UniProtKB/Swiss-Prot annotation:
PTM note: Formation of the three residue Trp-Tyr-Met cross-link is important for the catalase, but not the peroxidase activity of the enzyme.
Protein name: Catalase-peroxidase
Lineage, opening ranks: Bacteria, Pseudomonadati, Pseudomonadota, Betaproteobacteria, Rhodocyclales
Entry binding sites for heme b: H265
Homology family: Belongs to the peroxidase family. Peroxidase/catalase subfamily.
Cofactor binding: number and manner: Binds 1 heme b (iron(II)-protoporphyrin IX) group per dimer.
Gene3D superfamilies: 1.10.520.10, Peroxidase, domain 2
Cross-link (Tryptophyl-tyrosyl-methioninium (Trp-Tyr) (with M-250)): W96-Y224
Biological role: Bifunctional enzyme with both catalase and broad-spectrum peroxidase activity.
Disordered: region residues: 1-21
InterPro entries on file: Catalase_peroxidase (IPR000763), Haem_peroxidase (IPR002016), Haem_peroxidase_sf (IPR010255), Peroxidases_AS (IPR019794)
Amino acid sequence: MSNEQKCPFSGTHGARTTVGTQSNRDWWPKVLNLNILHQHAPAANPMDADFDYSETFKTLDFGALKQDLYALMTTSQDWWPADWGHYGGLFIRMAWHSAGTYRTGDGRGGAGTGNQRFAPINSWPDNGNLDKARRLLWPIKQKYGNKISWADLMILAGNCALESMGFKTFGFGGGRVDIWQPEEDIYWGAEREWLATSDKPNSRYSGERNLDNPLAAVQMGLIYVNPEGPDGNPDPVASGRDIRETFARMAMNDEETVALTAGGHTFGKAHGAGDPALVGPEPEAAPIEEQGLGWINKFGSGKGIHATTSGIEGAWKPNPTKWDNGYFDMLFGYEWELTRSPAGAKQWVAKDCKPEHLIPDAHDPSKKHPPMMTTADLAMRFDPIYGPISRRFHQDPAAFADAFARAWFKLTHRDLGPKARYLGPEVPAEDLVWQDPIPAVDHPLIEVTDVASLKAKLLASGLSTAELVSTAWASASTFRGSDKRGGANGARIRLAPQKDWAANQPAQLAKVLGVLEGIQQAFNSAQTGGKKVSLADLIVLGGCAAVEAAAKAAGFAVAVPFTPGRTDASQEQTDAESIAVLEPEADGFRNYQKKTYSVSAEEMLVDKAQLLTLSAPEMTVLVGGLRVLGGNVGGSSDGVFTTTPGTLSNDFFVNLLDMGTVWKPAAESAGRYEGRDRQTGVAKWTASRVDLIFGSNSQLRALAEVYAQNDAQEKFVRDFIAAWSKVMELDRFDLK
């Protein structure tokens, strides 16, 4: 008789679990992924339902926490000894790599969620041995508990590392809320191999090194660029081109890029002491007994003098635990000779190094080493743009220190959103243009009676339901939950570049804004006591009034929630280049697509919905409602499945699911479809892929059926208003 026991549930040998089985996406890889709309469910969150991190953070003894972090920097542990007795370089790298996943294209990545704790980021090759940094932090996290999130603690540890080595940081803002499971919405690349070069299958590059959007890193598993050069080619000038594109996609200009590179490499060292083949698997693949630690190294002691991380070995300058101008002294003070580290990585060593510039070994005081530079470092000297900036910083240490302080602050706060979200005693007073500043309210706000009066004026202004709804949606739907940018507050839709975006229908927008500004000026000039209505509020109020009127036309007297308090930003407070990344390439809610893409229109709709923090039901009801309200760009009839446009009816769903209609691709236009009467062949409707996906995809069809039922009209109106109001207030952090 076999000693193998049968599974008590199935009666067969071996437990039957979902591990190893084919998922729906394995069977049907092209099926629309709606899971990204339902991430981070309350059931996955261990915190109490009423837990408020921002309120809890206010009870933190911030000064005591910083003192504990300072002490940590120089308390070396035998299980992972500190280089030169100071963990500063390690914690700077941890914070940098937490923030450095951010990219402007979709605002995803960054330090805002503490996602370095989870796959895939916790196991990226570029994050080697940062698991040890987080374990070193654990006693402090354990001590302060929920008063400080992992996301905030990792960034604050980086600040304290800099400060403990003599650098004055620009400030710190808390407010990053931890997630509890890996994100599913972030596209990190199509490669199936870590560190795959651009000549490998599924490359992120095409043509003449054109990097796939919205990616910023040059290889799968890297934070920025390959330090050895493009695809490992040790060409500093070519590396400079990679660096410029990558850092630009992470919101950094040339000066900020030089400051960050030089400032970060002022501290610590790279590790490549031995054969990388002796380094074990990353944390997600490590044996259970390692308890989440990866990269266990069998070379010597595997740590300290024997540590291998990137494979590059050495420090950039003397005094690696002290802020000074030594990086530039070395960069410009020597010629550099290409060599290989003990781990085989390509790097550069100072030729004929002077004795006073030899760097004591991080763990063996009897040894000294010449400074090293990576190929990416040499780009700071030999790139025609970076070179002059580097020389200016070399000659002006104060300018360098200020530039690095500001760039580091930007790096670590870029995805935290507007300044209103920042917490703690070290928030800088200065407003920075990349924060998309919005003026504070400095006047009495409109009251309930004013709102009613303004609604009446808006509805009597001659503007159509479609014009009012489209303008409000265009203003509010720029919001991105990823980096908390965009939204209706600030009324930047009236400023460059938003006023000229094709999706915003510039001619119609100019007309609508002209009417709204007239109503605004008439109201404000009639007030005593300084009461005002902002254009930002009026834009949203116009949409709300139009929705109410459309619901009334459908037989429902409803009030769409509206809370005043938005203000109007100026053009000087608006960085046009920075705002440009918010322009929609596609917006399925408006049946808009700028051009044809390799990604389907319905996938882009789901991506947009995720950035708007919408659920699948919210996405569904908004599409159906916006279609019948005339929300399509250019007045397109696609998806307008109603004979009463401007009425908030459930006609979109009723007619989409009507089996009396048969759909065929339109002959004249890819991605468009014609719906004809099944019996007579008479043309009835036209539609886009976005429209038809609500009848094609099984999950979305199930939702569409809810709203197409005979008893669904009131629910449809109620749900549409709730979802509409959510979008209108996504950026109202003053209300949260």
